[in-house]
Amino acid sequence: MARFRGSITKVSRRLGIALAPKAEKYLERRPFPPGQHGQGRKGKVSEYALQLREKQKMKYLYGILEKQFRNYYKKAVSQRGVTGDNLVKLLERRFDNVVFRAGFAPSRSGARQLVTHGHLLINGKKVDIPSYIVSPSEVIEFRQRSKNMGAVTDSLNKAPESRIPSWIQVDKANQKAVFLSVPERVEVQEPFNEQLVVELYSK
């Protein structure tokens, strides 16, 4: 599947959020959009521009392109409940996102690589599809030959307990995680407004 190949730091500055760990230091130094006039840009932002920016935030944060993102939206609409909440829950249940949340990788892109390279199992079976939707009680662990990889061990050691969400139980010693439950929207602390995205697609 195609992935964004451009500069994640430039996109982070344009959207005003750190889309990856390496972008944080750039935002601290230059908290304004890139380009010759980035620092001096002012003026009223249109409703459409605000909606589009929130959609871009969500797409880049979770690392997905337009077609797949729109499919998530359609699925969210078809489910019971609040469409925006449903959309966030679907994105949080992506396999690569759960791997990232568990602390197995420092970024979602790193987590995606672990998944696509076949390092991980779900309930004892190899799953190499980043978009696989994880269900409550499913167990994620590394294949025997992939256990104790330096990058994974380093990521787990650096991941503070406070970063691991309550809906995922992590056994760092055995490099294993259990997806306990689907998170409620209020539990997901990400800098986007999904309701604006719903309004954009509803037009």
Swiss-Prot record:
Keywords: Ribonucleoprotein, Ribosomal protein, RNA-binding, rRNA-binding. One of its GO terms (biological process) is ribosomal small subunit biogenesis. Gene3D superfamilies: Ribosomal Protein S4 Delta 41, Chain A, domain 1 (1.10.1050.10), RNA-binding S4 domain (3.10.290.10). GO terms for molecular function: rRNA binding; structural constituent of ribosome. CDD domains: S4 (cd00165). SMART domains: Ribosomal_S4, S4. Pfam families: Ribosomal_S4 (PF00163), S4 (PF01479). GO terms for cellular component: small ribosomal subunit. InterPro entries: Ribosomal_uS4 (IPR022801), Ribosomal_uS4_bac-type (IPR005709), Ribosomal_uS4_N (IPR001912), S4_RNA-bd (IPR002942), S4_RNA-bd_sf (IPR036986). Coiled coil: none annotated. It comes from the Bacteria. Residues 93-173 form the S4 RNA-binding domain. One of the primary rRNA binding proteins, it binds directly to 16S rRNA where it nucleates assembly of the body of the 30S subunit. Belongs to the universal ribosomal protein uS4 family. Part of the 30S ribosomal subunit. Contacts protein S5. The interaction surface between S4 and S5 is involved in control of translational fidelity. This is Small ribosomal subunit protein uS4. The gene is rpsD.
